[in-house]
């Protein structure tokens, strides 16, 4: 019962946040410089008749009050109608559908690559605590966090195009961006896995398993793997949302026709309907992914369910992630 209430509460939070994002997007577009009528007519206002300008404003609903315009905006949004591009005259929804797949492909590929690399490295670092393997992994993780993604991307582009003379679309528009985005994400996951595993290795469950004569592989798989990975789920939600936002820079650096590239191109041409669509897509995606991550954590983590069932234990039942800094 408590789980259902908590899930409903998180879903309500998501709806409220999406509503706020939509309203803020509407306000920001209204405060942005320039007149959409000028952009649509593609002419200087002095060369256009007053009747033509008023007719265009009536068609766009610009003569209505802001409250009425907002109401129409929200109503159209609920029907997935984001208007038409000033430049191409295509529906914004269709444009987003054309550009979104490559962005989502790069983001989810980055997530998979990061998990496949960081979880084993985090386990190795914890099992070889304070040995040279652990130190090397920690140094590489620190460097990956310290260097900006665009700087890593520039270095990779220079190595591949100038030093290796490789000209490949798949390499430059998919493999290199995934590597660039994965490095920073891997570093955070490695540190989290390492810290959680170091703490769990000192737990009573592990000590009891060792006393029963269980080997280290059995203990790792049956006793440690699940509680080590569970705290990663909220981090993945945050990271995946950040990846979508981070693609704005990476897609323009690698010339990838995704949402980030579309957003920058629309800002340059002041194509406001497309800008609104891109901002809403990124905002909605981040909120929905984080909500899904919270719900998965709630369903899979027994400590979360215990805290919901007995709120008095909330301060007395520490989560794994709270003690992670001790071994960082």
Swiss-Prot record:
The complex is composed of two ATP-binding proteins (NikD and NikE), two transmembrane proteins (NikB and NikC) and a solute-binding protein (NikA). GO terms for molecular function: nickel cation transmembrane transporter activity. Keywords: Cell membrane, Ion transport, Membrane, Nickel, Nickel transport, Transmembrane, Transmembrane helix, Transport. The chain crosses the membrane at residues 11-31, 104-124, 139-159, 170-190, 229-249, 279-299. The keyword Transmembrane helix applies. This is Nickel import system permease protein NikB. InterPro entries: BPD_transp_1_N (IPR045621), MetI-like (IPR000515), MetI-like_sf (IPR035906), Opp2B (IPR050045). Gene3D superfamilies: MetI-like (1.10.3720.10). Its main location: membrane. Belongs to the binding-protein-dependent transport system permease family. OppBC subfamily. Coiled coil: none annotated. It comes from Staphylococcus aureus (strain N315). The keyword Transmembrane helix applies. Residues 100-297 form the ABC transmembrane type-1 domain. GO terms for cellular component: plasma membrane. It is a multi-pass membrane protein. Pfam families: BPD_transp_1, BPD_transp_1_N. It comes from the Bacteria. It is found in: Cell membrane. Part of the ABC transporter complex NikABCDE (Opp2) involved in nickel import. Probably responsible for the translocation of the substrate across the membrane.
């Amino acid at each position: 019962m408590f789980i259902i209430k908590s899930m409903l509460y998180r879903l309500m939070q998501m709806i409220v946040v999406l509503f706020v994002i939509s309203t803020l997007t509407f306000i920001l577009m209204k405060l942005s410089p320039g007149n959409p009528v000028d952009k649509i007519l593609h002419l200087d206002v002095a060369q256009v008749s007053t009747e033509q300008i008023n007719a265009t404003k009536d068609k766009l609903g610009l003569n209505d009050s802001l409250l009425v315009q907002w109401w129409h905006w929200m109503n159209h949004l609920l029907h997935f109608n984001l208007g038409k591009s000033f430049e191409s005259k295509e529906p914004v929804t269709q444009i987003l559908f054309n550009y979104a797949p490559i962005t989502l492909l790069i983001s989810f590929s980055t997530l998979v690559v990061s998990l496949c690399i960081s979880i084993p490295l985090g386990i190795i670092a914890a099992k070889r605590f304070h040995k040279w393997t652990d130190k090397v992994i920690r140094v590489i993780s620190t460097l990956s966090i310290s260097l900006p993604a665009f700087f890593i991307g520039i270095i990779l582009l220079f190595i591949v195009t100038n030093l290796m003379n490789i000209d490949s679309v798949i390499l430059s528009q998919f493999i290199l961006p995934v590597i660039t985005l994965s490095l920073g994400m891997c570093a955070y996951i490695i540190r989290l896995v390492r810290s959680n595993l170091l703490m769990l290795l000192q737990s009573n469950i592990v000590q009891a398993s060792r006393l029963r004569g269980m080997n280290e592989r059995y203990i790792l798989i049956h006793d440690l793997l699940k509680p080590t990975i569970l705290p990663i789920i909220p981090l993945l939600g945050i990271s995946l949302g950040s990846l979508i936002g981070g693609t704005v820079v990476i897609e323009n650096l690698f010339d990838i026709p995704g949402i980030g590239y579309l957003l920058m191109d629309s800002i340059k041409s002041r194509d406001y309907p497309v800008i609104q669509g891109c901002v809403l897509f990124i905002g909605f995606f981040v909120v929905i992914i984080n909500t899904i991550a919270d719900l998965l954590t709630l369903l899979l983590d027994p400590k979360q369910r215990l805290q919901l069932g007995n709120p008095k234990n909330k301060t007395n039942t520490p989560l794994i992630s709270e003690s992670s800094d001790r071994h960082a």
